Amino acid sequence: MTILDLAEKSRYLPGLSGKSLLAGSAELSRNIKGYPFPGSADDKARKAVEDLAEKAVGRWNREEKDPLFPFPVAALTSNERALLEDKGFLPGGIGKKSHVVLFVNGAGTLSVLVNGEDHLLIRAAGSDPDKLWRTVSYVDSFFGKDIPYAFDQEFGYLTASPYRAGTALRMKAELLVPGLIGSGALEEAARNAARKGFSIRRVYDAVDMKHPYVALSNEVTLGVSEETLAARMAQLLEDLEVAETMGWSKVFRSREMALKDKVWRALGALKYARLMDGEETLAAAALIALGIRENMFPDKEKNLVSQLLDAASGAYVKETTHKEELDEEGEALWRAVLVRNCIESAGF
């Protein structure tokens, strides 16, 4: 399996073009008792952590039906690392540090990063917060039979960042919420999330009707059980979906023809443009999602929006075309080729 194979298997959630949820994940950080955090560890300590992790992964692969495949990060190209960062598998700025290994299953839905910000980062991707939590918890317990975790009776699981101490569980979701933005309801939604220990933040440079993408994640990990965090996440996603549906109904009714015009113009640009930058592609993907939401056209393969969001990534364009040295114009040219192919494959 190549990095590109992994990227294409771990797209945004398929079949949800009419919904606000685009991607979801649960991340569980763990550190090993008796070893310094990766950021302050020497090569010998990092190698020892890698060896312990490999032992646990080896037993997993022998006993479980969902094997994990290794990707030593230092052996990857800079563009491959950038693509894995875009996909959420790697933290930013990890570079070519020694003994950093990413283990991933064949579907790209389960991964274990060794020697990242913490010794282990167990990550599961999907749409159901409870299932995601149970998945990372199962892996955590399985690995815990081979690995002594760093745990404090007062502070819980110890992490490199004090903001993750306690459960060390981070629930995340990326959403498309033009209804909340256009109706002015996003601020109230953010306040509601904050009351439950979560935050709503921008994904890209701005949050507006052109780029209506937001990220939801928990800010509290100490003093709250994992089950409670997962349940709160599920409830917030449900509340946001209801609020988005109501908000979008108001926005669409008040600007129906203007919004439909924007959708058709976006489709035309995707179908015929010869240069497309990432920002324009993100904006067009949002409009196409809204067109599908309003049944203006079908999404036969249930993955058109996710393909367009992938194409917005410069690393994805370079990896797909095998042209890592593309300049800005070359990247825009090849992105336009990719999105035209997406539109053609979708039957437009």
Tell me what each language-model feature is.
Residues 156-175:
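Conserved phosphate/anionic-ligand binding catalytic regions in large, soluble enzymes, centered on
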Residues 1-154, 169, 181-183, 187-348:
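Long, Pro/Ser/Thr-rich low-complexity/intrinsically disordered regulatory tracts in eukaryotic proteins
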